[in-house]
Each structure stands twice: as structure tokens, then as C-alpha cells.
Amino acid sequence: MAMPDFTMRQLLEAGVHFGHHTRRWNPRMAPFLFGVRNQVHIIDLQQTVPMLDRALKAIRDTVAGGGRVLFVGTKRAAADQIAEAAKRSGQYYVNHRWLGGMLTNWKTITGSIKRLRQIDDMLTGDTHGLTKKEILDITRNREKLERSLGGIKEMGGLPDILFVIDTNKEKLAVEEANKLGIPVVAILDSNSDPRGVTFPIPGNDDAIRAIALYCELVSGAVLDGISAELGASGQDFGAAEELPVDTAAEAAAAEAAPAA
């Protein structure tokens, strides 16, 4: 594996340079803006390129050191791609709704995850003695928990770095990470607040093509980090590279998981 490459042309074609209408801007983003076109702020890709590269290396190095990455993106344009990228690289995600205390009250979240596992065991086991209504209620409860916690139920502890799409919508996630000293990699649009973001990436956080590109690059950086971690432990990642990506990621994730 190798760090994912990207070009200025790819960023342009994905619309990474398009910000919001000038009336919606955040003045704190002024240093990262190139100018205005048709009343829309244009993001300075000359800054985005090195900042994106720096962020990807931070993610890669975190994973190479055995760390976990939490992908966060709950808005409709990002939700599916965030989940797919995390699964593809054997990592974790929140793509439904950020629950208050998801990081800062991890003990309570762990209890909810335990409840989700218990329900899974109940529904896959013997349901004799339960009425249809009871089974339906339990199933609905499970679906609710799965939407909120399904992406982190195998995480086993706090993440070591966050990757965030849309810091305005995910403000609570950024604040909780800051309180715990967890580094944050985030896409910053022209209406974003860069405060609290350790590795900012100026770019469009709404366009589906742009989000797809970010997710592809971040998952690639994660897989490169997994490769480096396995290589450092004397294991051959070459065979895993020949597997489908999902299979390789699952194998790597299992290797990195703490013992029960």
C-alpha cells in the first residue's frame, strides 16, 4: 500500500473550490479564500493541497501507531459515504446523529452498546415466550440503537483521531474531541469555524463528488497506515493487498482489535 495521491485537477473537477454565497461566510475563513465569483466564495486550493496532504499523513501515522479513526458525517450528502469509507478501511463511524456525550461520556455509551449486543443475541436466539408485539418493540429498539451506535459498537474505546465532514453540523463532536485532546481532521467550507480543528482542510463540504473524494483519500490513508503497522510487526500485508478491500480492512481491524 502507499499513501493516496491526488491532484489539483481532481480537486477542481470535484468542485472542492466552491464555497457558499458571500452572505453566508464565516470571516474566520478569510485566510483560506481565494476570492469571489458570482457572489460565491472561491476556496484557495493552493492552500488546500498541502493542508490535505498534511491531514492524510496525520491519519496514516495515527493508524500506523495502532490508533483508531472515527469518521463523522451525519448530513444526508455525507452519511452513506462516511459509513462506506469507514467500513472499507476497517474503522468506525457516526452517520446518523451525534449523541451528546458520545466521547465525553463514553461509559454510558458503552452501556448502550452492551444493550445493543444483548438485543442482537436475544433476536438471533430463542424468542419463544415473547409475543409478536414484544418482538416488534424489541426490534424497533434495536434498529434505533443500531442507527446511532452501529458504527462504533466494535470500537472498544475512544478514537485517536476524528475525520469530520461539516463542522457546523458536527459542532458537538468537535467540542467533545477538543475536551479530551483528541485531534480533529475536518473539511472547512467558507461558512465554517476553523477553531478547534487540528488539521483543517479548506474545501466544499456539500458537493457529493467532493465528499466522495475526501472519503476515498482518507480511507486510503487509513489502509496505508494499517499496512505500515503490520509491516512494523513483521507481518506480510502483500497477501491482504490482493484481497478485496473490505476483506483486507476486516482482517487488519481484527488484528488491531484489543484482546477480549
Swiss-Prot record:
InterPro entries to which the protein is assigned, alphabetical: Ribosomal_uS2, Ribosomal_uS2_bac/mit/plastid, Ribosomal_uS2_CS, Ribosomal_uS2_flav_dom_sf
Gene3D superfamilies, per database record: Glucose-6-phosphate isomerase like protein, domain 1 (3.40.50.10490), Helix hairpin bin (1.10.287.610)
Superkingdom of the organism of origin: Bacteria
Gene Ontology MF annotations: structural constituent of ribosome
GO biological process, one term: translation
Transmembrane segments: none
The keyword S-adenosyl-L-methionine is assigned to this record: no
A Pfam cross-reference name: Ribosomal_S2
Database matches in PROSITE patterns: RIBOSOMAL_S2_1, RIBOSOMAL_S2_2
Keywords, comma-separated and alphabetical: Ribonucleoprotein, Ribosomal protein
Entry's Gene Ontology cellular component terms: cytosolic small ribosomal subunit
Stretches of the chain forming a coiled coil according to its record: none
The UniProt record lists the keyword Ribosomal protein: yes
Signal peptide residues on this chain, from the entry's feature table: none
NCBIfam families hit by this protein: rpsB_bact (TIGR01011)
Family according to the record: Belongs to the universal ribosomal protein uS2 family.
PANTHER family assigned to the protein according to its UniProt record, in alphabetical order: 30S RIBOSOMAL PROTEIN S2 PROKARYOTIC AND ORGANELLAR (PTHR12534), SMALL RIBOSOMAL SUBUNIT PROTEIN US2M (PTHR12534:SF0)
Name of the protein described by the UniProt record: Small ribosomal subunit protein uS2
Annotated source species: Gluconacetobacter diazotrophicus (strain ATCC 49037 / DSM 5601 / CCUG 37298 / CIP 103539 / LMG 7603 / PAl5)
Gene: rpsB
